[in-house]
């Protein structure tokens, strides 16, 4: 099974996987961008042995899907689906971690910049330490022909090639978790699964006011985690898993510590307990 849901309002990521259960993942693509659901929708595979993927292209141009979690010949599995075409491939999800998937059709820059990406979590056979809350944050940037507020807006390829975004976001919307903060209680462990979808910029992941108790850089859930880490670079196309346990009631900004990104919307708030103060980040 696969799971999760639109995460734009910041719900926890539930574990809907199980040992040895096959997954049938259906991702109809169209030219408007995204893959059959809201930008950055997370899928949780939880200790799967085999994944079956069916790509149906309902658009007017070729599309494909590239799973970073797969060990498979890309010329067979990640090939273009022509308009109206549907095909299926299978892969073994044997490497635990949080991975990006995205449209890999040329120009890849344009397809990712149009929102055709997401995150997939593969849980390890030996469970990670218990977390009270789990959140998926997918960083990306947007290059718009308008300010992105008034529709319609479309991709500005000149801006994309110049790496000059109008907005930088978590899960597709600038500042959404400032308006709708994530939450936990004092003493609870919060786990963040972070993917940098790019298409170009990294996420310099940092939580203001605390230090990561555990950090699995590069989404390596096989090796022991780093401990006592302040900021970890999640490269474009990469992932990372981060645990924090916060005892003090308060509001904790979650940022990419490249502060141009914060100014352009890549900031979230984690409210621990019922804080009364505010932050200026």
Predicted regions, residues:
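Copper-binding active sites and cupredoxin-like electron-transfer domains
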Residues: 1, 14, 32, 38-281
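Short linear motifs in low-complexity or flexible loops
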Residues: 2, 6-11, 15-17, 22-24, ...
């Amino acid at each position: 099974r696969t799971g999760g849901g639109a995460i734009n309002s910041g719900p926890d990521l539930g574990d809907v996987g199980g040992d040895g259960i096959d997954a049938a993942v259906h991702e109809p693509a169209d030219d408007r961008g995204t893959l059959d659901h809201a930008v950055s929708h997370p899928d949780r595979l939880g200790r799967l042995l085999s994944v079956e993927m069916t790509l149906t292209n309902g658009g007017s141009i070729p599309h494909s899907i590239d799973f970073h979690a797969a060990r498979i010949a890309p010329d067979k599995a990640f090939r273009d689906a022509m308009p109206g075409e549907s095909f299926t491939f299978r892969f073994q999800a044997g490497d635990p971690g949080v991975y990006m998937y995205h449209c890999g059709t040329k120009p890849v820059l344009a397809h990712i910049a149009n929102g055709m990406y997401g995150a997939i979590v593969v849980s390890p056979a030996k469970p990670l330490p218990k977390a009270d809350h789990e959140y998926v944050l997918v960083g990306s940037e947007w290059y718009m022909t308008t300010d992105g507020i008034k529709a319609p807006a479309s991709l500005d390829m000149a801006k994309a090639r110049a790496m000059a975004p109008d907005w930088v976001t978590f899960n597709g919307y600038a500042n959404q978790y400032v308006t709708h903060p994530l939450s936990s209680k004092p003493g609870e462990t919060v786990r963040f699964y972070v993917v940098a979808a790019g298409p170009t910029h990294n996420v310099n992941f940092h939580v203001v006011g605390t230090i990561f108790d555990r950090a699995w850089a590069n989404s390596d859930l096989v090796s022991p985690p780093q401990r006592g880490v302040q900021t970890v670079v999640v490269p474009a196309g990469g992932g990372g898993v981060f645990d924090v346990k916060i005892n003090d009631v308060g509001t904790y900004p979650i940022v990419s510590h490249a502060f141009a990104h914060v100014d352009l919307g890549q900031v979230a708030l984690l409210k621990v307990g019922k804080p009364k103060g505010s932050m200026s980040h």
